[in-house]
Curated annotation (Swiss-Prot):
Assigned keywords, A-Z: Chromatin regulator, Chromosome, Cytoplasm, Isopeptide bond, Methylation, Methyltransferase, mRNA processing, mRNA splicing, Nucleus, Phosphoprotein, S-adenosyl-L-methionine, Transcription, Transcription regulation, Transferase, Ubl conjugation
Natural source organism: Rattus norvegicus (Rat)
Protein name stated in the entry: Histone-arginine methyltransferase CARM1
Enzyme class: transferase
Residues binding S-adenosyl-L-methionine: 160, 169, 193, 215, 244, 272
A Pfam family this chain is assigned to: PRMT_C
Function in brief: Methylates (mono- and asymmetric dimethylation) the guanidino nitrogens of arginyl residues in several proteins involved in DNA packaging, transcription regulation, pre-mRNA splicing, and mRNA stability. Recruited to promoters upon gene activation together with histone acetyltransferases from EP300/P300 and p160 families, methylates histone H3 at 'Arg-17' (H3R17me), forming mainly asymmetric dimethylarginine (H3R17me2a), leading to activation of transcription via chromatin remodeling.
Annotated CDD domains: AdoMet_MTases, PH_CARM1
Region described as Interaction with C9orf72: 28-139
Amino acid sequence: MAAAAATAVGPGAGSAGVAGPGGAGPCATVSVFPGARLLTIGDANGEIQRHAEQQALRLEVRAGPDAAGIALYSHEDVCVFKCSVSRETECSRVGRQSFIITLGCNSVLIQFATPHDFCSFYNILKTCRGHTLERSVFSERTEESSAVQYFQFYGYLSQQQNMMQDYVRTGTYQRAILQNHTDFKDKIVLDVGCGSGILSFFAAQAGARKIYAVEASTMAQHAEVLVKSNNLTDRIVVIPGKVEEVSLPEQVDIIISEPMGYMLFNERMLESYLHAKKYLKPSGNMFPTIGDVHLAPFTDEQLYMEQFTKANFWYQPSFHGVDLSALRGAAVDEYFRQPVVDTFDIRILMAKSVKYTVNFLEAKEGDLHRIEIPFKFHMLHSGLVHGLAFWFDVAFIGSIMTVWLSTAPTEPLTHWYQVRCLFQSPLFAKAGDTLSGTCLLIANKRQSYDISIVAQVDQTGSKSSNLLDLKNPFFRYTGTTPSPPPGSHYTSPSENMWNTGSTYNLSSGVAVAGMPTAYDLSSVIAGGSSVGHNNLIPLANTGIVNHTHSRMGSIMSTGIVQGNRVAGPWAGDLPPGLRTRSSYQWGPGRLRGHAGSSVPMTCPTGSSGAQGGGGSSSAHYAVNNQFTMGGPAISMASPMSIPTNTMHYGS
């Protein structure tokens, strides 16, 4: 897909004009490059003849579907050279900023004013000459239908908005770039898959001298508008096209991108990110620098029963008189092939996670075609293992500091959520047992992966496996608080509700023994545990989201504070006080689905819009409700389905 091939890049990019020679249609786009020079070379009669135009010329390129019309004009608007360049035309790049075209016995050498001008011209010409018909690295690994859907999806401003509004994602990127400003000051930067160009603007804020922003979807046109409106055309150059197919005029000092999908690898944009290293200087850096995929066994009887219950529709012996039961087995297989995208209570995990690391500075594209992750879990709890949970962290390792972006279930929720892969046959394991096996991801041409998981309890020999399609996930997130696993209370919740303080004075002056002086009902919802369920994604038209506990980019390194090692969240047994997090929302193949189906930003019809319960089907107000009992107003962590935003007791 050459999404923006008709959009010229560089100084003097013109507008649509009349048809040029060589098949450029009546609506062909005209690109103008001033300051070009022309040298004519021939060898008639066996002697080399040269003729150079003494003055700088204006080069106009009329881009058509099969050819490009090229014309050079003098200052007096006299055409001194004109030709058509198609797929059959003999032509080639010369040096950094020149191009040679051979017509019969003569050749013309066109020298551009800057390498940037030549790069823009060359990228336009490749598309016009039908180079999109050639099999680039991207085309070899991607079905055309998948690529069309993918780039169409990311060409929508609404999807760019969704990603930009992920506070954790966008804020962490900006913090990582600005905190490591020395890695960007006066440097050349490449932004792979720039989208709206937001990361390029961050690089400019950090002092980058030149940023090449490559974008294959039609979003490149919008990015160009933003660059111009922010007066950064001298520093940010938007290059329409795929990074596998465009050309850059120079090597770069650092590559930035946001290439992560569900389970880190979905959408296969990481391969484009690694491909871009052909433009990276030997001492260059990449932001992000490394990626860690974490996986851990989980127990969730409710989720498991949900999938089986859906498949039981096909168990009916008489659906409008038709026996559907022959398809019940196929339905079970299909539902269990879907990775589940949502979030969960940390207490469903049964062992410390296993980590698989990809160093983007060292990895090659081929390394991501087949990813094998062996695992051996030492079980911390007894129960049924229903599958494996996945999440990822990426690190921006700069000269000044390392900043982490995490999608862990203990951190503020992002539009990547977490992903869970179910077993059709759960495994029973006891605390102290080991669960070993392999997770194998095989890349497919649908910009995703086929997942094969095999797991075995070593002590009993019981084994389970499953095949899953990462391209077809089940988006389960509803905006409600994830439920803790059954049996999470080790003291009486009812007693804890009243035994959390000394005396509570109602506004009427009545003193109730055993009640606290400032009682927060959110502690009741937590069930006596210190797990604070603040990991909701705000639905449409909700109140202000409280990000007090999730400062952007504040995860400097996993399990390390200011250089001193501390026990990370997965060291040893899982403490009952592990917290969950704050908020956010999304849609396809990460979506950034980088396409697929999307999660609506409004509460699904018929589902509760209230955290932790409430029967309302409308979108809830996340943190606006105030609850008072004769004292100061208490902010409710859990929204309630009430007609007003304030409740008062004893008034």
